[in-house]
Amino acid sequence: MNPIHLDTLLTIIDEGSFENASLALSISPSAVSQRIKALEKSVGRVLVSRTQPAVATEAGEVLVQAARKMALLQAETREQLAERLDEIPLTVAINADSLSTWFPPVFAEVAHWGAVTLTLRVEDEAHTLSLLRRGSVLGAVTREADPVAGCEVLRLGVMRHLPVATPELRARYTVDGQPDWVRMPVLRFGPNDVLQDRDLEGRVDGAVARRRVSVVPSAEGFGEAVRLGLGWGLLPEAQAAPMLAAGDVVQLDEKVVDTPLYWQRWRLESRLLARLTDAVVDAARAGLRT
C-alpha cells in the first residue's frame, strides 16, 4: 500500500469530504479520487462511503487506524531527525463533563511540547470508544474497562454527578415533601446523553411519558441552565459545588451517580502518546474521586 494513498484516506476522514481533503493536501479533487481508487483497487475493498460527511467503511477503518499510527510515528521520527517537533497531531475523544472539569490541566502540560497540536472530539463517555475503534483518535476517556483490540487501558477515577435544581424549582415541584420527578422540568445534553437518560432510575417506578425536557448541548451552558432554573439536571460534583455553596441550587436527594472513567490508548511505542497518557492520568488523579 502506498503511504501517500493512506495519508489521503486519513485526510478525507478527518476533513469530512473529498473536496476538503483536496484543499488540505493542495491537490485537485480528481487527484484525491484517483488516489482512493488506487488504494481500493490494491486492497480489493471499498474504503470510503461517499456520504456527507465521508466515513470509512469497515475495511476502511482498519486502514484509517494504520494511517493514523503511521502519521504519529512519522512525525516523531522527523522530530528525532530534526531535533524539533513538527506539528505532531494528538487526537483524543472525551466527554463534555470531563473536558469542563478535570481535563484542562492537560492543556497546560501539552502547551510546553513545542509544536504539538491537540485535537479533541467531544462525545458521551459511553460512545467515545467507537471513535477509538474507528481509528479516529489515538486515545479516549471512556466508561468501558475492557480494552479495544490493540489498545491498553488505565483506570482514571470516578466522576460523581449530583441531582440539583434551583430552590424555586424544587419548591414548585414538590409532592408530600419529595421532588415531583414526573412533572419537574429536566435537562438533557443531547441524544446520546446516557447519564441523564437514566436519571429516574430508583426514583420513579416504570416509564414516564412526555416529560418536559430542554436540550442544552454544552457543559458550561448545561450548568448555567440548571443554575437559572430551566430544569433540574445531574451536574458533575466539581461544577455543582460552587453553586451549592452560593445557594444557587440545592441537591434534590441523596442518590448520586458515580461513573468510573478509563483512559484507552493505542498500544504504540510513542513517546508523545506516553507523555499524553501521563498528563491525562495526573489530571484525573487531581480532579476525580478514587
Curated annotation (Swiss-Prot):
SUPFAM superfamilies: Periplasmic binding protein-like II, Winged helix' DNA-binding domain
GO molecular function terms attached to this record: DNA binding; DNA-binding transcription factor activity
DNA-binding annotation, residue ranges on this chain: 18-37
Keywords (A to Z) from UniProt: Activator, DNA-binding, Transcription, Transcription regulation
Keyword Iron attributed: no
Domain called HTH lysR-type: residue spans: 1-57
Protein origin, superkingdom: Bacteria
Function summary: Positively regulates the expression of the exporter LysE.
Family: Belongs to the LysR transcriptional regulatory family.
UniProt-recorded name of the protein: Lysine export transcriptional regulatory protein LysG
Species of the source: Corynebacterium efficiens (strain DSM 44549 / YS-314 / AJ 12310 / JCM 11189 / NBRC 100395)
Highest classification ranks of the organism: Bacteria, Bacillati, Actinomycetota, Actinomycetes, Mycobacteriales
